[in-house]
Amino acid sequence: LSGMEDRTERSSCLRVGTYAVMHKIVLDYSLDKLLGQFFSERDMALLLDLAFYSIVEESNVAQHYPDYAYNHPLYSSGMKIYSDASVSDFFKSITKDKSTGFLNEWNAKRNRRERIYISYDSTNKNCQAGEIELAEFGHAKTDIGSAIINYSVGYDLKNKEPLFYEAYPGSINDVS
C-alpha cells in the first residue's frame, strides 16, 4: 500500500514480556552501569541482547540470534540486528581482563557480613564451530562425535546469584 513503510527489517509485533522482566532485573542490579565500566555502550547493549537471547531461547547458537532479534526488543541502538558473524567477532573481543574485572566488581557489591553457601557446577557443551582453542575431544555427557568445551559456574546457593564462572578445554574431565 502506498504510504506504508517497509517493515522487513523488524517484525511489526515485538514479544516484550520477558524483555520487561529482564529489563527490571538489569535496573535492579544496575547491570548496565556495571557492564558500562568494561564495555562501550554498543558492546554493553549487544552483550545484554545476547544474554536475553540465551535466556529466552535457551540457546547460545550465534547463527540463530538474528531470527530472535527480528521480533524481540533490543538494547542495541536503533534495535540494530547484528549478524551471526558480528556476534562471533564480539565474543572474540571479550578479554579475560574485562570478564575478570566485571566479576570482581560484581562480587565487591555483595554484603560481606552475610554468610553464603557456594554451589559449584560444571558441564560440557558440544561444539561444531571450527578453530576454537578450547574445543577439544573429551568425554561428553551427550556424545555426538564433536569437540566439546567445558564451563563451570559458582553461585550463592541462597539467592542463586553467580559469583564465578570459567571456561576450560574439552579434554579435561568434568568431575564436579
Q: Language-model features: where?
A:
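Dynamic "connector" segments at or just before major functional cores
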Residues: 1-134, 151-174
